[in-house]
């Protein structure tokens, strides 16, 4: 890689060097070249107008560099001419000197042209590097954030109001009227929602009452059975007391008058308790709804109680 770079550098330096005419050959060729040297020099020289146009924009190269370059090139050419040529070939030296100057001028013109091109390319690149501000090209919808749905909704809410309906109205009046219309619509919507919700509440209340009644029915039945059992126990207890009283009444010789009075009082209290129990039983019958079996039991109890009361009253009399 290094060798390739060195070769390219040498090739570039060789191409930059001015072309020199070969000084070998016979005296006839030299004389022929000396005769036509002026024609060749004029042919190599460009027009003065073109030279001015090419040298005018050259600002990068200073005068000192050009003087140094000329001082380096002229002595080398003079040394080479003294070494290879004789004193008789002074005219040829003049021609070579003119050719060397022309070649130097042509090289300078080429360098100036390249410098102009580099300046133009540099300015173009700097202009291209300057960034232009990016302008938004898409319309942003009105509303909160960039939500398109909210923008469309806000646009749909803006109803066009014609001037024929409100010729003397201002923007504030129109907005107040729109708000009042929206509030009226909301007020109309609320009673409808309440009406729709009321039947559901009634249905729910009906369902709950029906369920509670269904749940209470077995409790009523159990309560009626418990009361019938209590009545049976009380009736049996009272019957035993009455039988004891009857037995004591059948033995008047053994029982004193005080005991008789106590027995009479106990019978009266038993009657009052029986009447009270019968009254309570009737009241419970009116309140409760009993099964047919419980009704039959109650009838049997009533009949038995009434029979016992009649028997006790007949015995007392």
From Swiss-Prot:
Sorted UniProt keywords: Biomineralization, Cell adhesion, Cytokine, Glycoprotein, Phosphoprotein, Proteoglycan, Secreted, Sialic acid, Signal
Modification Phosphoserine occurs at: 26-27, 60, 62-63, 76, 78, 81, 106, 109, 112, 115, 118, 176, 180, 200, 204, 209, 213, 219, 224, 228, 257, 261, 266, 270, 273, 278, 283, 294, 306, 311, 313-314
Chief location of this protein within or outside the cell: secreted
Domain of life: Eukaryota
Modified-residue entries (Phosphothreonine), positions: 66, 170, 175, 222
Leader sequence residues: 1-16
One cellular-component annotation, GO: cell projection
Ranges spanned by the short sequence motif Cell attachment site, renumbered to the chain: 144-146
Family annotation (PROSITE patterns): OSTEOPONTIN
SMART domains according to UniProt: OSTEO
Renumbered residue ranges of the record's region Disordered: 43-297
Pfam families found in the cross-reference section: Osteopontin
Sequence ranges of Polar residues compositional bias: 49-63, 197-216
Single GO MF descriptor: integrin binding
Amino acid composition bias (Basic and acidic residues), ranges on this chain: 174-187, 223-240, 248-263, 273-297
PTM comment: Extensively phosphorylated by FAM20C in the extracellular medium at multiple sites within the S-x-E/pS motif. The phosphorylated form inhibits hydroxyapatite crystallization. Dephosphorylation via a mechanism involving ALPL/TNAP promotes hydroxyapatite crystallization.
InterPro entries: Osteopontin (IPR002038), Osteopontin_CS (IPR019841)
Subunit and interaction comment: Interacts (via N-terminus) with integrin ITGA9:ITGB1.
Protein role: Major non-collagenous bone protein that binds tightly to hydroxyapatite. Appears to form an integral part of the mineralized matrix. Probably important to cell-matrix interaction. Acts as a cytokine involved in enhancing production of interferon-gamma and interleukin-12 and reducing production of interleukin-10 and is essential in the pathway that leads to type I immunity.
Annotated family: Belongs to the osteopontin family.
Full protein name: Osteopontin
Organism: Rattus norvegicus (Rat)
Lineage: Eukaryota, Metazoa, Chordata, Craniata, Vertebrata
Annotated gene: Spp1
